[in-house]
Amino acid sequence: MMKMKRRKAYGLPYMGSKNRIAEWVVGALPANDTLVDLFAGGCAVTHCAMLSGKFNRVIANDISDAPEVFADAVNGNIDLSGFPLTRDEFKESTDTLSRLVYSFGNDQRYYIYSSEREDVCIAAERMMYGATVADRYAAYKVFIRALSSHLQCGDNLDRKVSRLQAIEAVARLQDIHGACPEAELETSRCDYRDFDAPAGSTVYADPPYNGTRISQYGGGFDYDAFEDWLAEVDFPVFVSEYTCPRGCVEIASRGSLSLADHSNSTRVVEGLFVQERFYDSVMAGDRDAE
């Protein structure tokens, strides 16, 4: 059984993150020398696995560069020199870190602050990012003027300004560096079909869930092709899904909340599945580990 200090958050602030169930996923995966996180995304499972003591090496693969951003966070190489970002700067930015931190719901598409409170929030952030006391004091004066202007107009910004989500995201990134992971991290950027998994490794796959849309895959993920791939490979793949992939069987499940959009959530059953032809060997391995 995995024993580790419970964390508040794992991985990058990332839309679709497995942060809330990362410990459950890692606890259900068989211990091994190497774990491959095939659709790593925001690297919540990667991060949790690195801290779990179950693996000596974790390979985070994705078609995006998010695992590279996570690796930078692990190594303390996060560059905040361009922060904070205004709405116009966000629109022009192609930097993954900036677009994650300054997007609503970390979707990299929509700017995090509404137009009505952008001036106040950006001024508040500049008070924190200022390199010198003079810089921070100048930002403080701008913040006070902006806040006073809103209050004079009768705007109620107390609740909206009390949380600077971008600052919270940066604090989360910096906390990753302070976690002292036990496992070695490697990153890869390729399609899951092109990844060459090390022999004998534990392979975990968290593809976009069947029926969902995701921008990294041109608006849609070819789930039939993924199921065909599962049928062809000569190693077990542990798949997170709400529904059982073709040719697979369930090895674990739990209820969780799914955010259907940025405001509503529904209760769903999250399952962990493996190809049926590997089920007996996987379960035998679990019994041997007990």
Task: Tell where the protein language model's regions lie, with residue ranges.
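S-adenosyl-L-methionine
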Residues: 1-51
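Conserved proline-anchored active-site loop of SAM-dependent methyltransferases
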Residues: 25, 35-49, 60-64, 97, ...
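Acidic, His/Gly-enriched loop-helix segments that form or flank divalent-metal centers
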Residues: 153-231
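Class I S-adenosyl-L-methionine-dependent methyltransferase module
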Residues: 52, 56-183
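Short, glycine/charged-enriched secondary-structure capping and boundary segments
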Residues: 51-54, 73-76, 217-220, 252-254
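Short glycine/proline-enriched coil/turn segments at helix->beta-strand junctions
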Residues: 29-34, 54-55, 75-76, 91-94, ...
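A conditional alpha-helix N-cap/helix-loop micro-motif detector
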Residues: 14-18, 90, 219
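Long, positively charged, glycine-interspersed low-complexity recognition regions
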Residues: 4, 210, 216-290
